[in-house]
């Protein structure tokens, strides 16, 4: 076989020197052949050598062995080196050497992984929908319609019937995938008007589908059919039943009252102007300045600090007072420096502070006290939103979700919390655990209030809310953009209602 012609430029020896120099400069080298999985390189799974006049590159791992003849290369960058290689039957192709420690190399590696998973997703669909036409399949971003490249999506068609499909990759968040799946379903229904797009097929990694399954149970089957599939590492796909995932990652700790003399030694700190004293459900007292906690009292002990906490002793009192003064100067609506870290930090906590102080402004039917934060607790930890649990004057619970910036996932994150509150309510656990003493709680499902600056509700919010079950009584409350100064309600919208 005659050799493939090499464009004029570097000799084979020079090409080898460039490759070796690039690899020596890499902190995290990897090899990428388009359409194949990324192959990390170590000194033990890679070789570059001359075989006669040919420069051969080989790389291997436990499942594959790659051998290519290198014929040319492009000018290298710090993050990647593009090679022209000869494959079987003299076919020419591209090969990339990447430094995953550099952002550009990591981005290309992620895109390659997305394309590989897209092809796995294609195989899933062929197996589950063998008689359907795979009309569209994409793993590219669509910013106009808020579609993420992290979750490949597809449109399946059979005559005048269609299905939306979306898959969560093995390392992805299956619960987040549902948000994008519902957006994709709505997009197809709006753009494929001659086809009845019946529902959404959601694919999730086996063992990680519970959060998505629980959310599916709270959607309206009349709005769309939703099918859940799980896949294994061996690409074995099974249809899942959301009703099989009834156990929740939630707990409800007993509600404890603080001791009568709790924190007497620290009353001077708690009484400082602008300090908020919030009693938590476990009896501890949180000391805050506009939502930002700087100290906590438990029994007669106080710990303080931003970030790293330490036990306070009497000689720390002056230091704590200076900390409060600093917070008061930086964390105020009248602050001159809006870029100051203490001003910008934890905006949801600041919004919570305003909501607690003016709960009846948000909804006149809500009792201002008691109001509980972060109960029930999530085993998964931080969720990026503030949860408050209140009760109205008739004894009906109300879940209040607070978000200071636009978040596509807010509706379904709020639904997570609503599901857990309803779970404990149905079992009578709030009353049994000491919450809302003296108030007879109604058995109706709780209300769900989404509170955010009016211009910060994500454009897809109405789309996702349109799929909620009628059992979920949801209301959006948009507050004025100057909410740090004053909490003013700009609109109230029920369900998926759109603002005029």
Model regions and ranges:
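Charged, terminal alpha-helix-loop-beta segments
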Residues: 1-500
């Amino acid at each position: 076989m005659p050799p493939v012609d090499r464009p004029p430029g570097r000799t084979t020896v020079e090409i080898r020197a460039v490759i070796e120099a690039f690899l020596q400069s890499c902190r995290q080298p990897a090899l990428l052949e388009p359409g194949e999985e990324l192959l990390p390189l170590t000194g033990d799974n890679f070789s570059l050598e001359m075989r006669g006049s040919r420069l051969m590159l080989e790389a291997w791992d436990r499942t594959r062995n790659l051998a290519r003849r290198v014929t040319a290369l492009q000018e290298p960058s710090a993050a990647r080196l593009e090679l022209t290689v000869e494959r079987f039957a003299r076919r020419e192709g591209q090969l990339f050497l990447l430094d995953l420690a550099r952002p550009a190399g990591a981005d290309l590696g992620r895109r390659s992984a997305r394309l590989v998973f897209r092809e796995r997703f294609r195989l899933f669909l062929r197996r589950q929908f063998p008689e359907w036409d795979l009309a569209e399949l994409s793993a590219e971003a669509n910013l106009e319609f808020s579609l993420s490249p992290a979750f490949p999506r597809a449109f399946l068609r059979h005559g005048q019937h269609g299905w939306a499909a979306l898959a969560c990759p093995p390392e992805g968040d299956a619960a987040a995938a549902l948000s994008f799946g519902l957006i994709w379903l709505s997009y197809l229904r709006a753009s494929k008007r001659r086809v009845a797009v019946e529902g959404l097929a959601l694919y999730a990694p086996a063992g990680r589908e519970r959060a998505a399954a629980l959310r599916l149970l709270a959607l309206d089957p009349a709005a769309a059919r939703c099918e859940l599939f799980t896949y294994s590492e061996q690409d074995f796909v099974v249809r899942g039943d959301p009703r099989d995932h009834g156990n929740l990652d939630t707990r409800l700790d007993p509600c404890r009252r603080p001791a009568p003399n709790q924190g007497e030694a620290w009353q001077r700190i708690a009484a400082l102007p602008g300090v908020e004293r919030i009693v938590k459900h476990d009896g501890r007292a949180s000391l805050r300045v506009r939502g930002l906690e700087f100290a906590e009292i438990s029994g007669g002990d106080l710990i303080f600090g931003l970030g790293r906490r330490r036990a306070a002793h009497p000689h720390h009192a002056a230091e704590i007072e200076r900390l409060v003064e600093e917070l008061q100067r930086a964390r105020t609506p009248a602050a001159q420096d809006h870029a100051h870290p203490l001003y910008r930090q934890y905006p949801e906590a600041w919004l919570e502070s305003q909501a607690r102080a003016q709960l009846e402004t948000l909804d006149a039917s809500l009792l201002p006290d008691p109001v509980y934060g972060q109960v029930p607790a999530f085993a998964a930890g931080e969720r990026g939103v503030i949860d408050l649990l209140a009760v109205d004057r008739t004894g009906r619970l109300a879940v209040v979700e607070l978000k200071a910036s636009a978040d596509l996932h807010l509706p379904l994150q709020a639904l997570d919390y609503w599901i857990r509150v309803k779970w404990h309510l149905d079992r009578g656990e709030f009353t049994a655990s000491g919450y809302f003493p003296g108030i007879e709680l109604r058995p109706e499902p709780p209300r769900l209030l989404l509170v955010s600056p009016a211009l910060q509700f994500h454009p897809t919010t109405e789309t996702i809310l349109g799929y909620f079950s009628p059992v979920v009584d949801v209301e959006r409350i948009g507050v004025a953009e100057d909410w740090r100064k004053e909490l003013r309600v700009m609109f109230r919208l029920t369900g998926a209602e759109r603002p005029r």
